Amino acid sequence: MDYNSTRSFTMTLAHRAVGDTRRGGFRQLRNYVDMCATLAKNQQQKDFFAYAQKALQRTDSCYYSLIHRLLDSVDEDRICTVGVNMGFGGLIYGASELKKQADLEGQPIAWITAARCGDERLSELLPKAARHGSFVWLLDATDTDPAQVVLLAKANPQSAFGLLADPSALTE
């Protein structure tokens, strides 16, 4: 399957997982984590899901309240979009593309890119980076208006963004 088909399938699975977890509770979440652990291909993925399995074994795990709060307060589409953009786009597909490039060039390439908001080159850099497999960004807006991130996110819907900003600068 090509990137877009696989991403679309992954998004469908993410929506199903969120819905099942909302309806069936954390047992469903553990089932999905177990399934992903079984399907994990490389060692980093296996390690990640082994850690997730271990964290979810304890019924008093702090992750349960965090997940419950997330499911209660965040729109399902946003949960799935961020999860797919970061998980599939950034850590699976993107990381694999970046590794191929790094092997060719003989030097590692980061899977997350940090930049300052207000940099005029960002609107050109994001699509170019995505073509090479880089979909995850950390943008610093501590000295600028964070509104640019909204425009960048709308223009690059397959990327995931983290934002450093003064909370008082954020509005709906």
Per-region residue spans from a language model:
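Core AdoMet radical
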Residues: 110-120, 129-145, 156-172
